[in-house]
């Protein structure tokens, strides 16, 4: 079994976001999941990027980059796979701009249109198939 866990958008939305508290929350949730599913493998994903603020004063969420880093650190420290959607779609400078430019974000600047969610799913699917094909080709884990 593979459990895919996506973190970061909601956690980083709060102005009171604390990176170490986020890391502890990840650990608690994954601890419960591991206890319930001890044989499962885990894949963590970073957030896709989001805006904060009201329409006219909306800015790219500056905390998302930290949330993505914390998720990657946690995955590395616990030998878990991570798919870094945040950097794949443009990272700090372009993730939100790319989503907006292609009309894949809803008006709230946080949630996605159906096409935006489909694209995220397709990108993850492509990454999983690529990793599987590399695994089969090399026989390495």
State each model region's role.
Residues 1-23:
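Oxyanion-hole/transition-state-stabilizing segment in secreted/luminal serine hydrolases
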Residues 2-6, 41-46, 81-85, 111:
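Structural recognition of the beta-strand scaffold that forms the well-ordered cores
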Residues 26-31, 68, 72:
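Generic structural signal for well-ordered alpha-helices
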Residues 49-141:
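Catalytic His-Asp segment of secreted/periplasmic serine-dependent ester chemistry enzymes
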């Amino acid at each position: 079994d593979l459990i895919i866990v996506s973190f970061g958008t909601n956690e980083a939305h709060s102005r009171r976001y604390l990176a170490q508290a986020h890391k502890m929350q990840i650990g608690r949730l994954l601890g419960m999941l591991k206890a319930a599913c001890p044989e499962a493998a885990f894949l963590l994903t970073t957030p896709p990027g989001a805006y904060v603020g009201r329409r006219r004063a909306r800015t790219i969420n500056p905390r998302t980059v930290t949330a993505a880093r914390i998720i990657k650190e946690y995955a590395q420290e616990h030998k878990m796979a991570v798919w870094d959607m945040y950097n794949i779609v443009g990272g700090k400078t372009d993730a939100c701009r790319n989503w907006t430019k292609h009309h894949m974000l809803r008006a709230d600047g946080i949630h996605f249109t159906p096409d935006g969610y489909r694209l995220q799913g397709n990108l993850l699917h492509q990454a999983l198939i690529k990793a599987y094909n590399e695994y089969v080709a090399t026989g390495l884990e």
